[in-house]
Amino acid sequence: MTASTKDILATAIRSIPDYPKPGIIFRDITTLLGDAAAFRLAVDELVKPYEGLGVDKIAGMEARGFILGGAMAHQLSAGFVPIRKKGKLPYRTVSMAYALEYGTDEMEIHVDAVKPGEKVILCDDLIATGGTAVGAVKLLRQIGAEVVSACFVIDLPDLGGRKALEALGVEVRTLAEFSGH
């Protein structure tokens, strides 16, 4: 990815200071999603490394991972798997607790969302501490997925999420980095 592509994507992301609490800068991709050219560029760049690899499924984390993951799945002719908050899926599920900044939460996936050995890419808008993404990787592996990679539009490298995923042996790809929180 070229420096100009990174600049275009970073510029399309709105930064909101002191949200959701003082000292946090919220990186809002809704501006990127609303800009047709930037959205197309982001999806094209997310997909590019995986073309021709025979990826079976894209797993998207609620909620912005659904938007990006659905677009990726379409372009890669792959299926899409939603990873949802507990209690939101209608069929039998497998769940996994994961760490939040203050406490824990649970995510779920349908028991039959992935066949054993299927190649899956995890997708979301942002990787920060990695708690949600690590939980999602463990959940996917629990039902037999081969997690090929995880991709995100934004990396907040100071928070260590990329390193947490890499410690699990998961390749991580991102499009833009922002320092701080």
From Swiss-Prot:
Pfam families hit by this protein: Pribosyltran
Pathway note: Purine metabolism; AMP biosynthesis via salvage pathway; AMP from adenine: step 1/1
GO terms for MF: adenine binding; adenine phosphoribosyltransferase activity; AMP binding
Subcellular localization: Cytoplasm
EC id: 2.4.2.7
Keywords (A to Z) from UniProt: Cytoplasm, Glycosyltransferase, Purine salvage, Transferase
Metal-binding in keyword set: no
EC primary class: transferase
Gene Ontology cellular-component annotations: cytoplasm
UniProt-listed GO biological process terms: adenine salvage; AMP salvage; purine ribonucleoside salvage
Reaction(s) catalysed by this chain's protein: AMP + diphosphate = 5-phospho-alpha-D-ribose 1-diphosphate + adenine
Protein's UniProt keywords contain Cytoplasm: yes
Described purpose of this protein according to its UniProt entry: Catalyzes a salvage reaction resulting in the formation of AMP, that is energically less costly than de novo synthesis.
HAMAP family per record: Aden_phosphoribosyltr
Entry's family note: Belongs to the purine/pyrimidine phosphoribosyltransferase family.
Subunit architecture: Homodimer.
Protein name in UniProt: Adenine phosphoribosyltransferase
Source organism: Neorhizobium galegae
Top-level taxonomy: Bacteria, Pseudomonadati, Pseudomonadota, Alphaproteobacteria, Hyphomicrobiales
